Amino acid sequence: MEESSSVAMLVPDIGEQEAILTAESIISPSLEIDEQRKTKPDPLIHVIQKLSKIVENEKSQKCLLIGKKRPRSSAATHSLETQELCEIPAKVIQSPAADTRRAEMSQTNFTPDTLAQNEGKAMSYQCSLCKFLSSSFSVLKDHIKQHGQQNEVILMCSECHITSRSQEELEAHVVNDHDNDANIHTQSKAQQCVSPSSSLCRKTTERNETIPDIPVSVDNLQTHTVQTASVAEMGRRKWYAYEQYGMYRCLFCSYTCGQQRMLKTHAWKHAGEVDCSYPIFENENEPLGLLDSSAAAAPGGVDAVVIAIGESELSIHNGPSVQVQICSSEQLSSSSPLEQSAERGVHLSQSVTLDPNEEEMLEVISDAEENLIPDSLLTSAQKIISSSPNKKGHVNVIVERLPSAEETLSQKRFLMNTEMEEGKDLSLTEAQIGREGMDDVYRADKCTVDIGGLIIGWSSSEKKDELMNKGLATDENAPPGRRRTNSESLRLHSLAAEALVTMPIRAAELTRANLGHYGDINLLDPDTSQRQVDSTLAAYSKMMSPLKNSSDGLTSLNQSNSTLVALPEGRQELSDGQVKTGISMSLLTVIEKLRERTDQNASDDDILKELQDNAQCQPNSDTSLSGNNVVEYIPNAERPYRCRLCHYTSGNKGYIKQHLRVHRQRQPYQCPICEHIADNSKDLESHMIHHCKTRIYQCKQCEESFHYKSQLRNHEREQHSLPDTLSIATSNEPRISSDTADGKCVQEGNKSSVQKQYRCDVCDYTSTTYVGVRNHRRIHNSDKPYRCSLCGYVCSHPPSLKSHMWKHASDQNYNYEQVNKAINDAISQSGRVLGKSPGKTQLKSSEESADPVTGSSENAVSSSELMSQTPSEVLGTNENEKLSPTSNTSYSLEKISSLAPPSMEYCVLLFCCCICGFESTSKENLLDHMKEHEGEIVNIILNKDHNTALNTN
C-alpha cells in the first residue's frame, strides 16, 4: 500500500532562513524513509554545504517553513496533470546572530494520529539543505539547532504561502482550505496570499504571479532526489538576475551592471563557487527578469521546488528523461504551449528536457535542431532549405548557432503549421504529447517555392491578416533582454552568408534563361540584389552583387508587379505577393543599425548635406513617401523616427531618409547608382560598365602604368623630374577606357535624372555622394592606405579596416574567416611590404592581401556602391562589345601583382563555396564552380522533401 506524505523544505535566502513544503510520493513507510534518507548520500547536500560556508557571514537566523497537505495515493500509475513551481519569497531580516551559519532545514513526519485525523493523509517536513525528514515538529526544531540555529521557525503553506508561527494554526489551514481543492486541480495557478500581517507572504504572491508553471513527469521514487537536484541545477545556472529597470545583478554578491559583458567579466571573481563556471548566455531562453526563482535571492541554494498538487499522482515511467514544459497561463490565451515551445527567444516560452542522469539539466533541445545536426559540409544549404517564412512575408534565414553565440529576445517567431497558427487554447495535459507532436511544430510552412534551388518562402495576405487579427505579431522594436553585440551580429550574418552562398547559381541560370523573355517593365526591382539584364553573364553578375546598394536597401526586395520566374503549378500567387529573398527583414534592420554604429566616416552633417543636395536635384524623390506618412515620429523615444513599411527605426532624420531608398520605386532600366535611366538593357549595360571599368593611367615617359593619377604624378615627379603642373596636364589623356563616351560625366546623360556629382580636387574621381569622395580623398593623403574592395573605404590603420568590414557582414559571399585572415596578414606584414618591389607584392590564394584591380578607387563610386567583382581588362573595346563571363578575370594573378604599387596594400573579399571550400576573387568563377555541385543541391532538396513526408506520416 503506497503511503503519501507531504514534505517541508527549508530554502535559504540572502540574509535569511526560510523553508518550503513540497509534496513527494513515498513508496515505503515514513520511518523507513527517514532511515534511508539519513544514510543515503545526496549530491545536493554537498553543494548546499559548500554554499553555507561561502555565505555564513551573510545569513540571518529566521527560518521560514512552508507546509502543504497531500492525499494518499490510490493507484500505482496516474497521468500527470499539473505541478507548480514554487519559489521562496525574497526578504532580508537582520538578526543579532547574523554571523552564524546559514540555516539548514530538517524534514519531519507528523505522528500517526495525524494520519488518522486527516483520513490517511500525512504532512511531513523536509530540509532543503540536508534532506532530513521527520514527522515531528519538535524533531525539526532539534535538527535546526544542529545547524547552529537558535531562533524561531516560521511556517508557510506551500500552496497559498500563508505564514504562521503556530504549528496548529497552519495545520488547520492546510486541512480546511486545501483538502477539497487538491482533488479538483487540473492546472496550476499562483495562489493569492491571504495573510495581512506578513509582508513576506505578500511579496511571495506578487512574485509568484509572474512565474510560469512546470508540468513534470517523474520516473520513480529513486529519481525524485535527482529531479529535485535537476531543478536546483536550474537555479544554480540562474546565477544572476535581470532587474526590470535594465540592470544585471549578481546573486553571489551585490554587484550590478548594465551590460552582460561586464557581468561576464565580474563572474570570474566567483569561479569555482557552487559549480559556478564562466557564464555563457547561450542557454538563456527564459525571459530575463520574469522567471525569477528563489535563486534570485538565495545565492546558489535550492531555488525551485516542484510541487504535486491534489490527486495528481506522480507517474511512474521507464523513459530515460523527464519532459518539462515551461509556459505561462496568461500566454495561453493567444498561442498554444506547443507554439510557444517552438519559438526560441520569444518571451514567456521555453522548452527544455530534463534528464535525471545528467548534470546539465537545462540544455535546450529542439527536434528541428536534432534533425539538422551537421554530418557534412552541406549543412548551410540544408538550413536554408529548411527555413520557413515569418508572418510578415520575409524569409527567415536559419543559421547554425556557435557555442558562444548569443540569441536576442526580439527574434521573430517562426510560423507554425495551420493548426498551431489558430492560436487556440490547449491545456497543459494536451501540451505534453512528447516529441512526436513536436515534430509537427517545426515543419516548414507549405508556402515555400523552390525556384531552381533558390528557396523563397512567403505568407499569403490572408494568413498575414489572420495573424495580425490574432494578435500574434511581435513588435520588432520591442527592447530585447540584451542587445546583440557587433561581433555577435557579424558572426550571425557570416553564418547566414554561408547558408546563402549555394543558392545564387541556380537563380542565375534560371534568370539568364527566363529573363530574356520579359521585355516589359518591373521585372526586377532595381533595389534588389538581382537585376534584369538581357545581356551577357559578366554584366549580369556585376548587378548580382548583393551589397551593391547598401544604402539603397542591402538585400531587400520590394513589390513586383510581374512574375519573378516561372513558378510551379498552383503557386502563382507569388507574382502578386510581396517577395523577399536573401536575408529576412529582421536581419536587414539589424544590419542597418549595425552600419549606423560602425560608420565612423559619415557624420550627421555629411548625410544631411548629401540628402539636401540630392533633394535639390530630385525634389520629388521623397515627397511621395512622406506624403503617405511612411515615416512615423514617436516623441520621447530613443529612436523617434520609424519606417512604417518595415519598422526600421533611427534616431537620426538623415538616416531614416537614407533608409527610404529601400522602398523607392525605380523606373525600368534605371541605374541604381546614379539614377541614370537607360532606354533598354543594352544601354543600361553600357552605362554600368562605366561604373565598373578599370582606369589605367600610363606614363608617357616610360611603360609604367598606374590606377591612380596621384601615383602617376608621384612617379613622374620622382622618376622623370616633371613638375606637378606638367604631370596634371599630361595625365588628362592616359586614361584607357572602353570608349570615350563612357568617360563623360553623368550630367550628360538623361537630363531628367541629373544628380549632382562630387569630384576629387586631386584627380578626376567622381561620386554621387560627398562621403564617397571624402573617402577617396584619403588615398592622396596617406602613404599606405588600406582599402576595402567592396565600397572603396580607405584607412591608414589596418584594425580600422577590420572594423569597417562589419558593415559588409550580410554579403552572401562574405567569408568572415578568410577576410579576417587577410587583414591580419596585412597587419603583420605591413612593415615588410615597403622593401618589396611591385612584382613581389604578396598575393596568396588564401589571403588575397594585395589586389589593386579589385580595390581600385573607381571600382566603387561611393560607400553605397559595392562592386566586389574583379574588373575586366577593357583595353581597346568599343561601345557595342560585351563582356564575356571570363573577361572579368582576364588578369592573371602575376599580372595583377606586377601592377601593384609598392606603397599600397589591399584586403580582398573572397567568394567562397560552402560545399567544398573553393575560393575565388571573382564571383563569376564561383558561379561557374557551383555548377559542379548542382546535383548535390538537388539531392539536398529531395532529401528535405522526403524527410518532410516522413515526418508528416
UniProtKB/Swiss-Prot annotation:
* SUPFAM superfamilies documented for this protein: beta-beta-alpha zinc fingers
Composition-biased stretches, type Polar residues, lie in 854-888
Keywords, A to Z, come to: DNA-binding, Metal-binding, Nucleus, Phosphoprotein, Repeat, Transcription, Transcription regulation, Zinc, Zinc-finger
Q: Please indicate which superkingdom the organism of origin belongs to.
A: Eukaryota
Q: Which GO terms describe its biological process?
A: positive regulation of transcription by RNA polymerase II
The residue stretches assigned to a coiled coil in this entry are none
GO terms assigned for molecular function:
DNA binding; zinc ion binding
Task: Show the Pfam families listed in the entry.
Answer: zf-C2H2 (PF00096)
Spell out which residues are annotated as carrying Phosphoserine.
95, 427
> GO CC annotations?
nucleus
Say yes or no: keyword Repeat present. yes
Q: Where in the cell is it found?
A: Nucleus
Where are the annotated C2H2-type zinc-finger regions?
Answer: 125-147, 155-185, 248-270, 641-663, 669-691, 697-720, 758-780, 786-808, 911-933
- For the region Disordered, give the residue spans: 470-489, 831-888
Functionally, this protein is described as follows:
May be involved in transcriptional regulation.
**Family, per entry:** Belongs to the krueppel C2H2-type zinc-finger protein family.
Recorded protein name is: Zinc finger protein 507
